[in-house]
Amino acid sequence: MNATGAGYPLASLYVGDLHPDVTEAMLYEKFSPAGPIMSIRVCRDIATRRSLGYAYINFQQPADAERALDTMNFEVIKGRPIRIMWSQRDPGLRKSGVGNVFIKNLDESIDNKALYDTFSAFGNILSCKVVCDEHGSRGYGFVHFETQEAANRAIQTMNGMLLNDRKVFVGHFKSRRERELEYGAKVMEFTNVYIKNFGEDMDDKRLREIFSAFGNTLSVKVMMDDTGRSRGFGFVNYGNHEEAQKAVSEMNGKEVNGRMIYVGRAQKRIERQGELKRKFEQIKQERINRYQGVNLYVKNLDDGIDDDRLRKEFSPYGTITSAKVMTEGGHSKGFGFVCFSSPEEATKAVTEMNGRIVSTKPLYVALAQRKEERKAILTNQYMQRLATMRAMPGPLLGSFQQPANYFLPAMPQPPNRTFYSPNPVAPVRQAPQWTSHQSRPPQYQPPAPLMRAVPPRRMSSNISTMKQASTQVPRVAPHSQRVANIGTQTAGARAQVNPSIMRTMPHYKYSCAVRNVQPIGTNTHLQQVMEPAVLMQGQEPLTASSLASAPPQEQKQMLGERLYPLIHEMHPTLAGKITGMLLEIDNSELLHMLESPESLHSKVEEAVAVLQAHQAKENSQKSAQQSLI
């Protein structure tokens, strides 16, 4: 076959049936003897980055690709035979069905290579596959020929032939829609009737006597178990459709042996499963529509809260149809669900109860979501971060080298979030377990924050918010002139920049989701450009992106180290308890509290009230116990 023909303008191969651990390097080592390779890409799941089991290899010359196809097809890599075919970029060629042959009733011992060797005598094969599951061959497969004439020859010769002592069916491939239309027409002319629920006191003779009144019965069978007792169902096959239809109409729902029997058209197992699945999906969708916008998810529940207490807490906001705390082994799992009678009541409950402290714990309340919805939202968030990372230009990534032979660029994620300048700066307390200089990639230079020199200004509080600017003036400067952003100052007014300087400066694109590298000059007045960040004396700036990039177990630690000194100023003796209570709140809400002293003060006072009420309750219980003694 000529790979340079009209259908295959590129020397590109599809390699399938790959082991999940196969990498680009392994494929390069395997295929490079065939000729120079331009690129190799193992396709991976966009969220988990796991291999999807296939890859594309682009050769420089079509002859090299053809040589690899002829000599390496079905070779074994990591214990699995690979399957190679030409990469067809036009989906119309793959889906047209021209030259595609379907084979069924295959012996379990026949694999892709055996099927390929058997049918290659009839013409050039584009692809060949035996369908398998976790248990092995499913007994059918497909062979896609280059021409329809070759497919016709294969069908005429092989249909009804024996392969490994089994008679196989070979025919033209039909799409599922075509098969369903054909099967639907046959279903309307059924002659086989299914009867169930007639009990154990039934045999073939008795069943024939009952159903022979509607026409000529070709066969009657009551299904038996191993002991010879009736399993309660059977089949009756009539000579024509009219007789079968009459039996169904007359006997369905009638009483036999004191039982109401079911009589209907006999169905294949896959058809019954399909109908049950459609029925289940319909019921599921109706339930989803019924509870859309009225079912609330409540988490961070105290262990002492049960169904009645949960209903009591939410009852002021509307009529509750159900309230359930999820348990395991009689112990609360810390979350539950509350269903209201209307979306308006549910919305009001979310507004009032989200973040409210109940039994020393702040609740998280939101509309309940199905697992598929949550997964889709998380995947969308991941894709947005991934797109932002890929939008960064090369100079911003320092000298970190990207692995070769990848279509999708690797995302450098430096483990260190703090860069300490060699210049003397104010001492900074390093957070434990957050940095590991040994884990940096070779030649990787940590990025410095973007700075614009502005007159410093004193702040009356230990906390401030950095406002993001919209312009940058990049200048190249030595490494020693980069400084870390440490302190409690905030950016002032936007600095004026000489237009002549702007014309000579290179322009870069910046991302708000990651920390960008910006070389700066020594003589240019620059204003710092960052996303909104919480600044604390002696600590690195905390932004939403830097918090999200940290491991989940460290996020609360980062927030707690910034919350504690602020709470300690308000209530020194209760700072530890209050900080622990507030850390149960969602991270985004905690960031807002750090940026808004009013919001923080409100939550702290609410927590103090809960602690005081709890202490008063304990004191009264102790007094009661002492009086009894």
UniProtKB/Swiss-Prot annotation:
Keyword Protein biosynthesis applies:
yes
GO biological process terms held by the UniProt record: chordate embryonic development; mRNA processing; mRNA stabilization; negative regulation of nuclear-transcribed mRNA poly(A) tail shortening; translation
Single GO term (MF): poly(A) binding
Per the record, its GO cellular-component terms are: cytoplasm
User: Keyword Cytoplasm, does the record have it?
Assistant: yes
Record-linked InterPro entries = Nucleotide-bd_a/b_plait_sf (IPR012677), PABP-dom (IPR036053), PABP_1234 (IPR006515), PABP_HYD_C (IPR002004), PABP_RRM1 (IPR034364), RBD_domain_sf (IPR035979), RRM2_I_PABPs (IPR045305), RRM_dom (IPR000504)
PROSITE patterns listed in its UniProt record: PABC, RRM
Q: Where in the cell is it found?
A: Cytoplasm
Q: What does this protein do?
A: Binds and protects the poly(A) tail of mRNA with or without an AU-rich element (ARE) and prevents mRNA deadenylation. Stimulates the translation of mRNAs to which it is bound during early development.
Query: Subunit info?
Result: Interacts with dazl in an RNA-independent manner. The C-terminus can self-associate and also interact with the C-terminus of pabpc1, independently of RNA. RRM 1 and RRM 2 interact with both eif4g1 and paip1, and the C-terminus also interacts with paip1. Prior to oocyte maturation, found in a complex with dazl and pum2 proteins and spdy1 mRNA; pum2 dissociates from the complex during maturation. Interacts with the translation termination factor sup35/erf3.
Family statement? Belongs to the polyadenylate-binding protein type-1 family.
Q: What name is this protein filed under?
A: Embryonic polyadenylate-binding protein
| Gene of this entry | epabp
